[in-house]
Design a protein with these regions (language model features):
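N-terminal FAD-binding dinucleotide-binding subdomain shared by FAD-dependent oxidases/monooxygenases
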Residues: 1-262
Length: 262
């Protein structure tokens, strides 16, 4: 759904959404100038999350005069409300903050102190692999679903993938897997902050986040069909990146790694 309503034709879809909103708030309720100021965001659909009003109660409340939408930048708070950069003031008895979120900066370790070969883990030194592993971090897998569609769609195929890896390791008497990029992956450029239309809470932590690329399997995809193809129908193990080993081999000074097609 996200691919249909946002990514492929962002300009056209933004125009469509604005037209739909305008049809719900006719000119007798709001002038063109006011509507364009408050209902024409600087970002495209899905660059920031959409809000839905299934019963149309949001627009009915505006037409009834019970609600008002103001799009601006907060300059500061005072004892009576909110001061905006435009110079406008909004009086408020109660302010419910919906911004100011802070994402974890050491994904996916959060507050855990992790070291690999006596070196501290730093997120922005590692590529994400298939959306569920990190380069040079052995025996680590994590499950993260989709944000714009059902979380479990991605979670399920990721869990199935890990199950196949563990079964393979049991069969081959292996006890370690690790992803190696061999210095061959080009990082996706991080957006210029002045041009980035992402939510502020993602901008604040972008430089501390893991690296990703346009090259599969180091790309981050949000399409179930593409992910399912990558996980289930491609050469999952013998792809040149995921390596396996046995501690018994290493203890015997046998530096063999094993890869196989699943």
């Amino acid at each position: 759904m996200r691919e249909i309503l946002g990514n492929r034709t962002p300009e056209q879809n933004k125009k469509m959404f604005i037209q739909i909103m305008r049809s719900q708030i006719p000119k007798e309720y709001m002038s063109d100038e006011e509507f364009n100021k408050h209902f024409n965001p600087k970002y495209f659909p899905w660059e920031q999350r959409l809000c839905l009003s299934p019963d149309n109660d949001f627009f009915e409340s505006i037409k009834n005069g019970n609600s008002k939408v103001v799009t601006d930048t907060i300059e500061r708070f005072d004892e009576n409300g909110i001061c905006l950069q435009s110079g406008e003031r909004l009086d408020a008895d109660i302010i419910i903050t919906a911004t100011g979120l802070n994402l974890q900066t050491n994904f996916p370790m959060a507050t855990m102190q992790v070291t690999v070969d006596q070196k501290a883990y730093v997120a922005n030194e590692h590529f994400i692999y298939k959306g569920c592993m990190l380069t040079d971090v052995p025996n680590l897998g994590f499950v993260q679903g989709y944000f714009q569609s059902s979380w479990t769609l991605k979670a399920d195929i990721t869990a199935e993938y890990f199950t196949r890896i563990l079964n393979f390791m049991d069969d081959e008497k292996l006890d370690m897997f690790v992803v190696k990029d061999h210095g061959k992956i080009q990082e996706m450029p991080r957006p210029d902050p002045s041009e980035d239309r992402s939510p502020n809470y993602t901008k604040r932590t972008r430089e501390y986040s893991v690296k990703y690329s346009e090259q599969i399997p180091f790309a981050v995809m949000s399409n179930f069909e593409e992910d399912r193809e990558m996980f289930q129908n491609s050469d999952l193990i013998n792809d040149g990146w995921l390596e396996f080993a046995s501690s018994r081999q290493n203890n015997n000074n046998n530096n063999n790694t094993v890869s196989s097609r699943l």
